């Protein structure tokens, strides 16, 4: 029998300044939480975005 594969989960990237959901990603479970600097169109600048699960 083969091992079952871990399926990718849908996660949201939430802006730390405004709390808005600006991006969605598909990521395999496990590992550290993402924290990326992405563009926020409402503020018109790059801000830190943190991972939040569905």
Curated annotation (Swiss-Prot):
It comes from the Bacteria. GO terms for molecular function: structural constituent of ribosome. The keyword RNA-binding does not apply. It holds the Pfam family Ribosomal_L33. The keyword Ribonucleoprotein applies. GO terms for cellular component: cytoplasm; ribonucleoprotein complex; ribosome. One of its GO terms (biological process) is translation. Gene3D superfamilies: Ribosomal protein L33 (2.20.28.120). Keywords: Ribonucleoprotein, Ribosomal protein. Belongs to the bacterial ribosomal protein bL33 family. This is Large ribosomal subunit protein bL33.
